[in-house]
Amino acid sequence: MSEDTALVVGLGNPGPQYEKTRHNVGFMVAGVLSARMGGKFSAHKKSGAEIVQGRLEGRPTILAKPRSFMNLSGSAVAGLARFFSVDPGNIVVIHDELDLDFGTIRLKQGGGEGGHNGLRSISQSLGTKDYLRTRVGIGRPPGRMDPASYVLKPFSSVERKELDLVCEESADAVELVLRLGLEAAQNRLH
């Protein structure tokens, strides 16, 4: 990818009651990336997000966590993109993915939102679906459990044992796409 500024957004819900839920895996990966950047999140009042500014893979990067609930995260993402003059093609959104087994990581650009209301909000606010996504698999709910309830539950004890590694590998995938671009990163990862 180019030296243009990248906007990397981890999706999640604010508040301690959501901190360890499946829906917040994007926030968890953003935490790993902020440590790698050597920065701490601070409020960016004009966008309604917390950000870290620095470099990832030598590239200028704005790392963000919207402070709104996930379903309303689009306004923060669009606000940051405008404020920092970041084109949608240089935005990477990290999110939970029901349609991937727990721990599976996939990169893609554009496409549908797959029922993910955070992605829908971002697509509507940006006016395009053409941004990069780092999809972190959380698996399907067991039995007849409602997916909306499932994503707001904490990871299982078995999953928690693997969660740190999954977050590290997801952060690696973000760095890979920033360094190599989507196609080369997909070839390495998938």
Curated annotation (Swiss-Prot):
Record key words, sorted: Cytoplasm, Hydrolase, RNA-binding, tRNA-binding
One of the record's GO molecular function terms: peptidyl-tRNA hydrolase activity
EC number(s) stated in the UniProt entry for this protein: 3.1.1.29
Root EC class: hydrolase
Primary location recorded for the protein, binned into one broad class: cytoplasm
PROSITE patterns in alphabetical order: PEPT_TRNA_HYDROL_2 (PS01196)
Catalytic activity: an N-acyl-L-alpha-aminoacyl-tRNA + H2O = an N-acyl-L-amino acid + a tRNA + H(+)
SUPFAM superfamilies linked: Peptidyl-tRNA hydrolase-like (SSF53178)
Residues under site feature: Discriminates between blocked and unblocked aminoacyl-tRNA: 13
GO cellular component, one term: cytoplasm
Annotated site, Stabilizes the basic form of H active site to accept a proton, chain positions: 96
Subcellular location(s) per record: Cytoplasm
UniProt keyword RNA-binding present: yes
PANTHER family per UniProt: PEPTIDYL-TRNA HYDROLASE
Function recorded in the entry: Hydrolyzes ribosome-free peptidyl-tRNAs (with 1 or more amino acids incorporated), which drop off the ribosome during protein synthesis, or as a result of ribosome stalling.
NCBIfam families (alphabetical): pth
Family: Belongs to the PTH family.
Protein name: Peptidyl-tRNA hydrolase
